A protein has these predicted regions:
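Non-heme di-metal
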Residues: 1-290
Length: 290
């Protein structure tokens, strides 16, 4: 039986793919509604999106056992790099002095340490949910119509990517059972507890290469490493209500995935402990049988 998801995901994403020339209303640009401060945040997001390059290299390296998922990376990588490109195209047209240099883009390409593939999958699923909400909030903040449309457009891509990752999580659940449940619940607890952390919990803001610490987050390699917190807290004002939406979306999807209702990170953590204890008992039993 063929259980590959890539062919179907390719068709569904291809059907809604937007055209950078035809679907972005470039002729509606209003220079009076774009400040230098806003243009700088667009530059930072363009560079951040470029980090899909090292993320893809990581995914392909750590998923050599899974050609279906690796093939899907071709679609994900294309669309994420397109996000970087459309933001750079906006700057090229309307703030050319702000276009990232090749050196600035290349700075975010560095090796990520190997990590458990299932945990990484869950981390990026949560990252897509978070980015969808960040971009929707950014679209609300901007009044210039073209960049507003761009953020709305790429936010929908991020939501679709999250949906695709969820399909692979369901497949992993069928193939790996409690091992997958434990991995997804572990990262889910971390991501659903973001309100208690100082820094935004997104893959681009996490340490991923011990040898390069502290310059081992994507954000630490940007021209302004402190921009993200300022963008979220002071500019687009991604407040508690927005954060609540992110957490609710994560818990809602895990409730469906695990067929058990979670309304708080604490409930999910209790489930994580149950599953971990179960997997440990199975592992102990296998050792005893040897």
């Amino acid at each position: 039986m063929n259980t590959m998801l890539y062919p179907e995901l390719y068709r569904s994403l291809e059907a809604v793919r937007w055209d950078m020339e035809k679907d972005i209303p470039w002729d509606k640009f209003d220079a009076s509604l774009l400040t230098d401060e806003q243009a700088k945040t667009i530059k930072m997001n363009a560079i951040t999106e470029w980090s899909a390059l090292p993320a893809t290299e990581m995914f392909l390296r750590d998923n050599q056992h899974d050609s279906d998922f690796s093939a899907f990376m071709s679609v994900w990588f294309f669309e994420e790099q397109k996000h970087s490109l459309v933001l750079m195209e906006y700057l090229r047209r309307f703030r050319p002095e702000m276009v990232p240099t090749e050196e600035e883009l290349h700075a975010v390409r560095f090796e990520f340490d190997p990590a458990p593939p299932l945990e990484t999958l869950m981390l990026h699923f949560c990252g897509e949910i978070r980015l969808n909400h960040w971009y929707r909030c950014a679209a609300d903040w901007h009044t210039e119509p073209v960049i507003k449309q761009i953020y709305e457009t790429i936010s929908r891509d991020e939501a679709r990517h999250g949906g695709a990752y969820l399909r692979y999580m369901k497949k992993a659940l069928n193939n790996c059972g409690d091992v997958a449940r434990a991995a997804f619940a572990k990262i889910g607890v971390l991501m659903a507890s973001a309100r208690r952390t100082e820094k935004p919990l997104h893959p681009t803001n996490l340490h991923v290469n011990q040898a390069l610490f502290p310059r081992d987050t994507v954000q630490s390699r940007l021209p302004d490493p402190e921009w993200l917190e300022r963008w979220l807290d002071e500019q687009i004002r991604f407040d508690g209500e927005w954060e609540k939406k992110v957490v609710e979306r994560i818990l809602h999807n895990l409730s469906i995935l695990f067929e058990r209702t979670f309304t708080t990170a604490q409930e999910l953590n209790r489930y994580r402990r149950e599953v971990t204890a179960r997997t440990n008992r199975v592992a102990d039993g296998m050792v005893d049988a040897i």
